[in-house]
Amino acid sequence: MLRRTLLASAAAFAGLTGAAVAQDDPLKVGFVYVGPVGDGGWTYEHHQGLLAVEEHFGDAVETVFVESVPEGPDAERVMTQMALEGADLIFTTSFGYMDPTINVAAQFPDVRFEHATGFKTADNVSNYSARFYEGRAVQGHIAGQMTESNIIGYIASFPIPEVIRGINSAYLHAKEVNPDVEFKIIWAYTWFDPAKEAEAANTLIEQGADFILQHTDSTAPQAAAEAANEAGATVYTFGQASDMIEFAPAPRVSSIIDNWAPYYIDRTQAVIDGSWETVSTWDGMDTGMVEIGEITDAVPAEIKASAEEMIAAITAGDYHPFTGPINRQDGSAWLADGETAADYGNEGIAGMNFYVEGLTAEVPQ
């Protein structure tokens, strides 16, 4: 029978470094979530990965998870408890879990840790993320052509490179097809807070936005747009992190789907067979870690076709969303004509902390 618990009672713990797990000894895999599993977005999709691990491995694994864990000291406490209770592999699924993950991993050298969206590693800590900015390019391409008000609203979470990259990518591709487009950005300073997210969406709609993009985790912006449409407005959205298909065909006209399941299965298998090692993974459409949800018929056929061409080009590696010429917001050159951005280094997108030319807001400091 498949074994799964929220937090099991204390159990004996045996180190597994460099050795495969015995066939009759289930591997205990833990997941730490920043939101509830029912958030409909970020955490929901990570939990789908957990369920895929269970389905793939059956009785060979036991999974545990804790949801709605704040970033900071609480996260460190939860990770410590998981390790003490026998977890062999722990996935920590929010950027703000980075330092807690490193701290706890140092205390449990025989436990493997996998941290999502961060950049630090250790002998027993890997990190992984997805190239969400690829999906943002598609969203900008669609929104820029469909907007009637020329105002696109963006609900941002925290001013970290991952979020700034997404804003820049969406803006560049909206501007490419619509030189008159304007982005209005609201920083929510939260990953998951439906009330704040709804308030941000409503504010943007009041400011004239007829497209709402989000880098927050709940479906509240979708519901806010739906309510606005019922009141006579025309507002469109994109599902974030998960398909959010319940809001299709409108306001949700497509989505970015984070597909973590293959990665979770692969890393779990590596621990089982003794081949786990520290890696940094940053995958995108090419591997299927980033997927684009169905583009609905609310999108005109010619726009849908051009968006699908962009998806195919990014997936094949024929197009990079950050291809020059691109200037920084202050007008200084960043990428020359035809030059594609590096991942790392002083000019790389991994540490992106600036807006591109044309965005009028300021990056919060």
Please state what every model-predicted region is.
Residues 2-7:
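N-terminal export leaders
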Residues 8-15:
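Bacterial N-terminal signal peptides
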Residues 17-22:
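Sec/Tat signal peptide C-region and signal peptidase I cleavage site
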Residues 23-365:
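A residue-level marker of the well-folded mature domains of exported/periplasmic proteins
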